[in-house]
């Protein structure tokens, strides 16, 4: 806490830490008004995440404890949380304890991706396009063209090891 102001007989003397009343010949009132230091916690994101208690600036008083929680949108993941310029890793919440200075917290997200690996059991018998590993964003769509070589036919297609028939 700090001295916000000193009031002597209804007159604000300002934020002083000492004064003297000389030649006292009447009653006096002295009021000292204290205030708590205030600090700002600034939170930022690159999007696709809800930050609680609030995204942006939060004012807290000296010694406060403040818990932040992060809830990502569907198909997004937290890739880092940065507090005062230092990574604290991939966390779903962070607590500031005994706040005595301004603070920053940033939540970094990215879209979730998946890898689809497409192969054929015998390359001489036909092909699948695109072949190999393909990266697809969450909730995305990937189409494949399957063609049998001359003299062959498609007997079965497996997706994650499960038959979907001769498509």
Report each predicted region and the residues it spans.
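Extracellular/surface recognition and adhesion modules
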Residues: 6, 32, 41-43, 49-51, ...
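Short, solvent-exposed loop/edge segments of extracellular or virion-exposed proteins
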Residues: 12-14, 40-59, 87-89, 117-136, ...
